[in-house]
Amino acid sequence: MEQVDYNCIFCAIAAKRAPAAIVYESADALAFLDIHPVMEGHTLVIPKKHCRNLFDLDDESGKAVMHAARIVARALRAAFSADGLTVLQSNERAGGQAVFHYHAHLAPRFFNDGLMARMETERQLAWRARGNPTREELERVAEKIRAHIKED
């Protein structure tokens, strides 16, 4: 762990200066239970190195988090006999990020758990309000994004 933000609760958890129910730890990543779970077993996976969000995440930390997420996902499926898993990751306040240390949410999912129905309703309302794009509109947006692609 090279970089720490001493005002960051997730850095404090990674340094064992704040309590957490840890489910997995590697040299560069940590997984612990969310204190506001949407489902039993809802787990957060973080890099131990402080990275604000996906925009700041370095390749080494990203690989460590995804490796840990795969291990924890398999454990969640086995521990809860889950039918599936939702992975959520938010960036910046407008994207729904509340703690500014990169983290991925892993939530075990079950048929008829109600969570997908709420998400599906919101998505359908958004689609109705916006409408589905034409193929030409999709190509225009894709070109706009491609113009800004930069390899690290």
Which sequence ranges carry the predicted segments?
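HIT superfamily nucleotide-processing domains
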Residues: M1-D152
